[in-house]
Amino acid sequence: MIKRLGKAFLCNLLERQVVKLRSKHLFKIVAVGGSVGKTSTKLAIAKTLSASRRVIYQDGNYNDRLTVPLVLFGHAEPGIFNIFAWFRILINNSRQIKGDYPFDIAVLEIGTDAPGQMEQFAYLKPDLYVLTAVAEEHMEYFAGLDAVAKEELQPAKFSNKVLVNINDTAAQYLVGLPLIGYGLDLETDYTLVERHEHGLMGQKLIISTATGKQFSVEVSALGKQGAKLVLAAAAVADQLGIEQEGIIKGLQSIKPVSGRMQILSGINGSTLIDDTYNASPIAVKAALDVLYKTDAN
């Protein structure tokens, strides 16, 4: 009871500080949500944008009501009962609000475990919301996929623009929504014209943008899932007005992170594909697809 009340009190204070930060400083917020792929997509977007902009983000999965505000101010989460640590955070936040905020873009991950939680992020007013997928993950408190879709699309109500992975979000949930689409092998705003895989060395992608422009880029991200990450990052960068040269440079900096399609050297000259971090069925299938296409020699 005390823990819950204390957390709610802190959340209210932090959220009010974020609102003040937004009112005092001009910076963009990109929020990433979805049933699967949030963290990988967030990191791909952040790495891409960092090539030409000052970007703040968090490497892990700070994505709930308490931790999301911490990302904007650059803090790690202390223990809920560490009163002095929280006091220092609140004081530091006030100083940042009054001073110079040294970032152009904040890339945030927002998550939900139950209906109604996404509405708690309305105060962020994202400039761009990225929906990675609507899938049957974390279903404990959802009646079905329709309920998941309704929840994951809530940010569309309070975001300036919405970017959706068309491959992994059923069309029936997107009817009538003003959105920007990205996907593989589909007619949508951002899509792949060609994809050439180089085994475990990466792949070459030719990307078509919303304005019809095309460009090619060599990336180390693997398989179709890796291509989706790159496509999402390219779409976000383009929507934020970054020039093509900056987009390509940023996309080339995307690297597999620990536990997510990471290539490791094993014993006796063997190679491992490490996709063990909180792997969903979709992620496991994607990793197996890469494995099956790899030359055993």
Model features per residue range: what roles?
Residues 1-33, 40-52, 66, 73, ...:
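Short, basic phosphate-binding NTP loop
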Residues 15-25, 50-150, 246:
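ATP-dependent carboxylate-amine ligase catalytic core
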Residues 45, 49, 71-72, 230-240, ...:
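Buried hydrophobic packing segments
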Residues 25-27, 102, 123, 127-271, ...:
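Acidic, Mg2+-coordinating active-site environments of NTP-dependent enzymes
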Residues 140, 257, 276-297:
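Active-site beta-alpha connecting loops in nucleotide-dependent enzymes
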Residues 31, 56-57, 105-109, 163, ...:
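Short catalytic-loop micro-motif centered on adjacent basic/acidic residues
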Residues 117-120, 170, 286-290:
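A short acidic, amphipathic alpha-helical/loop segment
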